[in-house]
Amino acid sequence: MKALWAVLLVTLLAGCLAEGEPEVTDQLEWQSSQPWEQALNRFWDYLRWVQTLSDQVQEELQSSQVTQELTVLMEDTMTEVKAYKKELEEQLGPVAEETRARLAKEVQAAQARLGADMEDLRNRLGQYRNEVHTMLGQSTEEIRARLSTHLRKMRKRLMRDAEDLQKRLAVYKAGAREGAERGVSALRERLGPLVEQGRQRTANLGAGAAQPLRDRAQAFGDRIRGRLEEVGNQARDRLEEVREHMEEVRSKMEEQTQQIRLQAEIFQARLKGWFEPIVEDMHRQWANLMEKIQASVATNPIISTPMPQENQ
């Protein structure tokens, strides 16, 4: 909280010094680190170009192009300021409601002054365009001189507004940072005793309940060990039964295989006994038939009959 009041005091002193000095430097005295500052610098550069009142500036002033460009730059700046303010509001955290309201009111006032002066500048440029249009064919030097003077004054006002807004936002940011740090400290203070109580309770429970837990773990381990041994014995017995059964099956299969082999040999011998006489008898009959054919051919040779010749 001391840091916040220190920033407020510096801001007030800076404001007093600013009121005592009518002249303002031509450049904004900060680094454009935030988007709203970058948008304001773009507006500032364009205004510096308008203030030259060159022939191109006067031509664009008469065509309303300058006021349109300024409108876009104004809207961009105000949009970025609102976005940055909203971001800081989300970071304020547990800051007192009174402090939050006061800081928000100060930033809102500075923001409103900057927006109003920007609007005044745009209206003055529109008024200049209307005055020039009503004086067609006449000298407009006096109008340009008045506009130049007004632009210098408006530039100083806008610069003061911008610097004041930047300082108010800096205070707002400091309040957000302090609120966050204070919130963390308060949370640490609230949770510290609870954490210590929990640690002490855990230590007490560990000291008092360690032995019962060990006894229960030992008993549980013994039960598990006994159950595992029982299951192992049952598995071994079952495996032995399966092995004996498989041995019995193998013996039966070998016996049946031997019986089938013997039966096949007997059947083969029977088939051989059945078919061998038949085959031998067929061989004899075939041999006799061949002998008869050969004898018949030898005794009755075939006489070749001459082929009839064709008429010549």
Swiss-Prot record:
PTM characteristics: APOE exists as multiple glycosylated and sialylated glycoforms within cells and in plasma. The extent of glycosylation and sialylation are tissue and context specific. Glycated in plasma VLDL.
Region called Homooligomerization, residue ranges: 258-312
Coiled coil region boundaries: none
Methionine sulfoxide modification, residue list: 135
GO cellular component, one term: very-low-density lipoprotein particle
Placement of Sequence repeats on the sequence: 72-93, 94-115, 116-137, 138-159, 160-181, 182-203, 204-225, 226-247
Leader sequence segment: 1-18
Region called LDL and other lipoprotein receptors binding, residue ranges: 150-160
Keywords: Chylomicron, Endosome, Extracellular matrix, Glycoprotein, HDL, Heparin-binding, Lipid transport, Lipid-binding, Oxidation, Phosphoprotein, Repeat, Secreted, Signal, Transport, VLDL
Classification via InterPro entries: ApoA_E, Apolipoprotein_A1/A4/E
Residues with the Phosphoserine modification: 139
Localization in the cell: Secreted; Secreted, Extracellular space; Secreted, Extracellular space, Extracellular matrix; Extracellular vesicle
GO terms of biological process kind: AMPA glutamate receptor clustering; amyloid precursor protein metabolic process; artery morphogenesis; cellular response to lipoprotein particle stimulus; cholesterol catabolic process; cholesterol efflux; cholesterol homeostasis; chylomicron remnant clearance
Top-level taxon in the UniProt lineage: Eukaryota
Span list, region Specificity for association with VLDL: 270-282
Subunit structure: Homotetramer. May interact with ABCA1; functionally associated with ABCA1 in the biogenesis of HDLs. May interact with APP/A4 amyloid-beta peptide; the interaction is extremely stable in vitro but its physiological significance is unclear. May interact with MAPT. May interact with MAP2. In the cerebrospinal fluid, interacts with secreted SORL1. Interacts with PMEL; this allows the loading of PMEL luminal fragment on ILVs to induce fibril nucleation.
Function description: APOE is an apolipoprotein, a protein associating with lipid particles, that mainly functions in lipoprotein-mediated lipid transport between organs via the plasma and interstitial fluids. APOE is a core component of plasma lipoproteins and is involved in their production, conversion and clearance. Apolipoproteins are amphipathic molecules that interact both with lipids of the lipoprotein particle core and the aqueous environment of the plasma.
Name of protein: Apolipoprotein E
Source organism (scientific name): Mus pahari (Gairdner's shrew-mouse)
Taxonomic classification: Eukaryota, Metazoa, Chordata, Craniata, Vertebrata
Gene that this sequence comes from: Apoe
